[in-house]
Amino acid sequence: MKTGSSVENVRRLVSADLSKVLLLAKSCPEAAQWLPSEFELHIEDVRGWVIGDREILFGFLAVRTITSAHEMELLNLAVGPNWRRRGYASALLNVALSECRSIGIQSVFLEVRESNQRAISFYTKHGFAPSGRRPNYYRNPDEAALTMSFKLAN
């Protein structure tokens, strides 16, 4: 696969990807670390996408839609350390936002560690704005979350 951010390289996350997604997340300490049981418990509620080739996942994105509120929560976005700065995170986010628009989602929100300046810059570049703060949201280490939101144009 040539490196690049082409959305043609993004596909839906399927349950067979679970072990690769969990391994990828472990290689990214800033990503939310889910237990396999947590992921399996929520697999019906979570939509996800992966980017990679037949053997290796470069990154993944997981969201939960709250249809009654026309909202989507971005739960986790991670790109492996060896695959960063190639546009893969942007490709994943763009596919997710495109699907949100197509199903009538009006806003997207997320939480990010206050110390994760790289992620905050990434989301800001993609149109997200700070919308609040949640003290002591994260554990290991304890840290506040910055909440960010993005309004989708219909």
What are these regions (language model features)?
Residues 1, 107, 113, 142-151:
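Conserved catalytic core of the tyrosine transesterase superfamily
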Residues 68-70, 116, 139-144:
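Short acidic/glycine-enriched loop/turn segments that link adjacent beta-strands
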Residues 76, 120-122, 143-145:
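Short secondary-structure transition/capping segments
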Residues 80-94, 101-103, 107, 113-121, ...:
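Conserved glycine-rich acetyl-CoA-binding loop
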Residues 111, 129-145:
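Conserved catalytic-core motifs of GNAT/GCN5-like acyltransferases
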